[in-house]
Amino acid sequence: NDQLRFNRAELLEWATARNLDVSPDLFAREESSHALLPTVSQALADGGIVYGVPGGDRAAVLHAVVSVMKLPAEVDHDELCQVLLARECLGSTGIGDGIAIPHVRNPLVLHVTQPTITLCFLASPIDFHALDGKPVNTLFTLISPTVKTHLHLLSWLSYALRNPAFKEAIKRQAPRDELMLRLAAAEAAVDR
């Protein structure tokens, strides 16, 4: 048939990893309603912000991250760690500037009902094999119930990370309240 087809999730991950400026609306389908999809602020409020997460390598850090995540009781923590590590083997989720966005390749694997983003600041930076070669000290771990929600949150998070005030607050590991205010301002700066 000589047609090229691209997976939306893989395309967004590729663009995010290369720090390309991608509008969140690019991945929205016309029939979708943004009113029904959560904001990054909502997902982060549900997932939480954790400081001083230990670990000397990707595996140890991901185990520590999963242990502090607010997950439903039926989610197997060891299985989630394995899925996140398998995703890292396909290609690092380290997007540069000390930030990684670990997430499962297929959101439906976990069977969760509520999307969450857990922001973890590491006790010490680690090599996450990021494209820019810099060690990672900040992880936004994304868990979604559907591919649509996954793409929505991943694209909006990638967009928010381009906001200078939000990014600066992340770099200095600002207090929770300030981070949430900066994120809300970054989201509000874009016409939804």
Residue ranges and their predicted role:
Residues 1-192:
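Cytosolic covalent-transfer regions centered on His/Cys nucleophiles
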